[in-house]
């Protein structure tokens, strides 16, 4: 039958990889140097669940960045998020410091990626959810396969995005609307509901895919060559990393409105008590319980995400949700 021949302009990384030695490799991920001194981060754990080892490779790429970084893999799903088995073990051991430390490392990894002095291109396909999507959100540009499903789904297991997902969604909605109150409400709603876009075009309604910046591609085998070309294009144009976003967390009656929305949902039988606990934890990241809004830095929002995550991890309801998903494959409503 001979070797598989792919059309011009198409590359399948699983074929390219056979001729390459990784710069760094562990059980979860590998870092490669491709032609023209571009780095490629490949996740390859089970279901591409993210662990500390995955993030170690992300940080290594940000340091040894060459002329650009591409985050891409050939698996059916880019990454469905952080490894929940690891979290459940930490919760059962009541190792809150361990959870906090994991989130600190995760945050520092996505920040290092975003602040790298070279272009960072994410080229996902399939499920790109939770922590997997948080990595994509910190890239300069997304070149996504048309089947990519994007979203922050953490609330379904009783936690909040803890790697900049809330922060980044909030910034994007503010860029789109120029209104912090609207940005806070939209972020709260879609993170609270764990909404996903089942294609790049549908993800655009959540600001998860930015049509004016990002690209959707029908042929999966073109993702890598397009990403490599984009690194060249950005470098030729004189690349500089984006500066940190300055935030405002709106005050007034916004938190009360959010609480009332949840209470009505519970009364109508749409929500369960723990849904409100989780929703108000998200609210606490993007709003302030004071008459006026307050300025906030990106680092403060990261810290609020992390605190909210750890506080929820301490609740028996969240432990039950994570256990239900891992042990029965069902999303527990409690």
Predicted features and spans:
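Gly/Pro- and small hydrophobic-enriched strand-loop and loop-to-helix capping segments
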Residues: 139-162, 207-223
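Intrinsically disordered, low-complexity segments enriched in small/flexible residues
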Residues: 1-70, 172-199, 205, 211-334
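Flexible loop/turn segments at secondary-structure boundaries
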Residues: 48-50, 76-81, 128-132, 151-152, ...
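Alpha-helix capping and helix-loop boundary segments enriched in small/acidic/polar residues
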Residues: 49, 90-104, 123-130, 156-160, ...
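A structural preference for short, pocket-lining loop segments at secondary-structure junctions
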Residues: 40-42, 55-97, 104-123, 145-149, ...
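Active-site-adjacent scaffolding segments
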Residues: 123, 146, 156, 163-180
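Glycine-rich beta-to-alpha active-site loop
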Residues: 111-157, 191
């Amino acid at each position: 039958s001979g070797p598989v021949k792919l059309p011009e302009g198409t590359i399948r990384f699983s074929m390219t990889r056979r001729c390459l030695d990784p710069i760094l490799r562990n059980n979860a991920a590998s870092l490669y140097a491709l032609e023209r001194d571009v780095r490629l981060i490949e996740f390859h754990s089970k279901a591409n669940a993210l662990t500390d080892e995955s993030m170690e490779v992300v940080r290594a790429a940000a340091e040894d960045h060459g002329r650009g970084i591409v985050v891409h893999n050939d698996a059916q799903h880019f990454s469905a998020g952080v490894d929940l088995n690891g979290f459940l073990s930490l919760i059962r051991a009541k190792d809150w410091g361990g959870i906090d430390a994991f989130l600190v490392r995760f945050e520092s990894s996505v920040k290092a990626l975003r602040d790298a002095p070279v272009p960072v291109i994410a080229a996902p396909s399939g499920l790109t959810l939770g922590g997997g999507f948080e990595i994509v959100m910190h890239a300069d540009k997304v070149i996504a396969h048309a089947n990519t499903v994007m979203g922050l789904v953490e609330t379904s297991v009783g936690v909040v995005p803890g790697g900049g997902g809330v922060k980044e969604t909030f910034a994007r909605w503010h860029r789109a609307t120029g209104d912090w109150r609207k940005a806070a409400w939209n972020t709260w709603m879609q993170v609270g509901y764990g909404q996903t876009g089942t294609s790049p075009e549908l993800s655009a309604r959540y600001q998860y895919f930015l049509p004016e910046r990002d690209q959707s591609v029908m042929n999966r085998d073109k993702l890598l060559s397009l990403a490599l070309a984009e690194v060249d294009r950005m470098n030729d144009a004189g690349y500089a990393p984006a500066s940190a976003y300055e935030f405002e967390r709106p005050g007034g009656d916004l938190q009360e409105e959010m609480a009332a929305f949840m209470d009505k949902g519970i009364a109508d039988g749409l929500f369960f008590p723990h849904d409100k606990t989780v929703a108000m934890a998200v609210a606490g990241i993007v709003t302030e319980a004071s008459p006026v809004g307050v300025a906030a830095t990106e680092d403060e929002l990261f810290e609020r995400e992390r605190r909210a995550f750890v506080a929820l991890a301490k609740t028996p309801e969240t432990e039950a949700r994570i256990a239900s998903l891992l042990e029965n494959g069902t999303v527990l409503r409690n």
